[in-house]
């Protein structure tokens, strides 16, 4: 790890046997566009490696899903292994463009439901990744103003 003027740069080692960095991305519903931009940048970064080894990988994004049942409940599924990886989960709780069917009606996801999807994906990892980092454009539940009365 290299620290330079408050920015932390991680040095990843490209494994010769598996041609892998141990880096993985998961996008929760509504954050796919941001995850794709990050993925494209990582692919160009590792394909232009100056370390003598180049990574030939199509994507860092792991296939995952948060399907919903008819009663509104959901579950988190990860279709690829996360064992030993540095996992970055990208979640956008401010995105109201994601909807789901609830008893025949299309309901937009609230920030609480986005946060629940994040917790479902973390629970689906079963503690197998080396490290889990959550990337959120908006810190959900991080109110920064003064309280006036007895409020949460």
Please report, for each region that a protein language model flagged, where it lies by residue.
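PRPP-associated nucleotide enzymes
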Residues: 1-152
């Amino acid at each position: 790890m290299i620290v330079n003027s408050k920015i932390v740069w991680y040095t990843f080692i490209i494994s010769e046997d598996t041609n892998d960095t141990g880096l993985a991305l998961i996008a929760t519903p509504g954050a796919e566009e941001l995850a794709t931009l990050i993925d494209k940048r990582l692919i160009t970064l590792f394909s232009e490696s100056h370390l003598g080894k180049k990574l030939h990988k199509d994507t860092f994004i792991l296939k995952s899903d948060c399907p919903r049942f008819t009663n509104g409940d959901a579950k988190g599924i990860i279709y690829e292994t996360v064992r030993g990886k540095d996992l970055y989960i990208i979640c956008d709780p401010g995105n109201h463009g994601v909807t789901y069917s609830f008893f025949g009606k299309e309901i937009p996801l609230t920030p609480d439901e986005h946060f629940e999807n994040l917790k479902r994906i973390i629970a689906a990892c079963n503690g197998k990744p080396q490290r889990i980092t959550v990337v959120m454009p908006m810190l959900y539940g991080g109110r920064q103003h003064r309280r006036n009365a007895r409020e949460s």
